[in-house]
Amino acid sequence: MNYKELISERLSSIIELPIEDIEKLIEIPPKPEMGDFAFPCFQLAKTFRKAPNMIAEELKDKFDKSNFEKVENLGPYLNFFVDKSIFSKNVIEKILEEKDKYGASNEGKGRKALIEYSSPNIAKPFHVGHLFSTAIGNALYKIFTFEGYDCERLNHLGDWGTQFGKLIAAYKRWVDEEALEKEPIKELLRIYVKFHDEAEKDPALEEEGRLHFKRLEDGEEEEVKLWKKFRELSLKEFEKVYHMLNVEFDSYAGESFYGDKMDAVVEEIDEKGLLVESNGAKVVMLEDYNMPPCIIKKSDGATIYATRDLATAIYRKKTYDFYKSIYVVGLEQSLHFKQVFTTLKLMGHDWADDCTHIGFGLVRFTDRKLSTRKGEVIFLEDLLKESVDKTLEIINEKNSELENKEETAKKIGIGAVIFTYLKNNRERDIVFSWDEMLSFDGETGPYVQYSYARGKSILRKSGEIQGDVDYSKLNSKEEFELVKTLEGFNKSILQAIEKLEPSIVTRYVIEVAKAFNKFYNHNSILNAEDEEIKKARIKLVESTCQVIKNALNLLGIEVVEKM
C-alpha cells in the first residue's frame, strides 16, 4: 500500500481534484509528532471560499480513516498518522520482494537521454578534476536508467586542436620512446611542458607547431599517424582509470569526429541570416539575450568550440532523437553553453530546450593546485591508488585477519573518493582531506559501507527466517523512523532526476545509515526479548541492507560484505 496514493485517492473523492495534483501537494511534516504525512489546504481556500483551517477541519470529519492510526487538523493542515504496523509491513515486504529493483520505476519509459561526461583531453593527464564530471555523469546514467530511461553514455574526447601541432613538434624533437611506451601520458606531458618552456625562449617553435597542425588538418600522412598514436595511447591509459572506477561508455566520438560536420552548420546559420561580421570574425549576435556574440569563425577563418558544439548537438538530435541531452561540464563553461543553446533556438531548433548544461565546482587541495602547462598536476590514477593504499593500512591496523583485504581496500578506497565527489551540491567546490574522506565515522563512503557490512554480519549470524513475521512488533521510535526513511528511496531518486543532482541520493543513503545505526544502538536484534520481535528486526535489517546496496550502486560505489 502506498499511503500517499491512498491519501490522494480518498481526498480526491471529497474535494474533486485530480489524484496526481493532490499527491504533489502532500508533504512530510518536519516533526514526527505532527504526523507522517500532511496536506496543506491553502490552495483550496479560493475554490471553497473558506479559511484553510476550516477546510482542514471539514476534511478531517469526512475522511475515511481506515488504515490510519488517526487523522488530525492542525491549523490549515490535515495531518495523517499511519497505522505503523501496516506501514512497516508494506515497506519491508515491498523491498524484500523487489530486491535490486526497489526504488526503480517506469518514469522514463520510451524516453532517450544522452549524458555527455568525463571527456578528457588526449595526451594530457586524467587528473583529479576530471573525476567530478566522470562521477556525476556515471551516477546520472545509473539513476536515469534505473527509472526506465534509455540512456547513451557519451565521452566527447578532446582529441583535436592546435595543441596537437605543438605536441607533434615536441615529439619530433624530444621524445623518449622507452618512457612513452612505459608511461605514455607522463612522457607526452613532459614534452608538452618542455615545448612551452622552450617556446618562451624561441618563439619560432610556436610557428612550427602551427605548421604541423595545418598539415594534420590537411590529412598529411606523418601528422595523422602521430595524432592517431597519441589518441590510442591516451585512450589505453584512460581506460585503466575507467576500469578502476567501473565506468563504461557507449561512444568515444570526440571533437575530431565532428570536424567534417561544421561547414554545413556555418552554411545553415548563414542561410538563416544570423551570421554577421564583427572585428573580422563571423558571429551570431546575442545582445537581445544579454550575452556576448557567439563566435562561429575567427578572423583567420578557423572554426572554434561553439561551431563544433552546434554541429555535435545537431548530429546527436538526428542520430538519437533524444528526449533530454545533458552536458556534464565545469561551471566555467556556463556562458558558452547558453550561447550554443540560444544559437540553436535562433536557427529554428526548438529541441534546444531539451539540452541542459549541468556544471560543477573545483577540486582544491590544501597544498596543491592543478595546471597542465607547467606539469604540476595530480593524476587521478595516482590518487585512487593512494586512497586504496591508505585504506589497506587502516584495515591492517583494525582487522588484520580480514579475508580479501586488497579487494576490500579497493572497494572502500575508491568508493570513498567517489562518495566525496558526490556528497554535496555539485556546484560546490571540494576541499580534499584524506582524514575526513577515509573516516569510518561521519558522512563518508566508508561509514555507509560499514553500516551495510554491519547489517550483513547480523544476517549471517541470524540465518534464514522461517514462518510469518509480525511487523506490529516494530513499535520503537527508532524502528519506525528507519522504516520511514527506507520508504523515501524512490522519492529521492526522482528528485535527483528533476534537479540533475546525484548528491540527493548520496544525502539520502547517509540518512539511511544514520537511522540504521540509531536503531542498532537502541534495539537488541539477535538477543531480542522474544522470537517475534527478533524476526521482525532481522527483516528490517535485511531491507536496510538492500536499500543501501541499491543506493550505492546508483552512485557507482560497490558494497563490502565484511569489514
UniProtKB/Swiss-Prot annotation:
Keywords: Aminoacyl-tRNA synthetase, ATP-binding, Cytoplasm, Ligase, Nucleotide-binding, Protein biosynthesis. A motif ('HIGH' region) lies at residues 120-130. Its EC number is 6.1.1.19. PROSITE patterns: AA_TRNA_LIGASE_I. One of its GO terms (cellular component) is cytoplasm. It is found in: Cytoplasm. Monomer. HAMAP family: Arg_tRNA_synth (MF_00123). NCBIfam families: argS. This is Arginine--tRNA ligase. It comes from Clostridium tetani (strain Massachusetts / E88). The gene is argS.
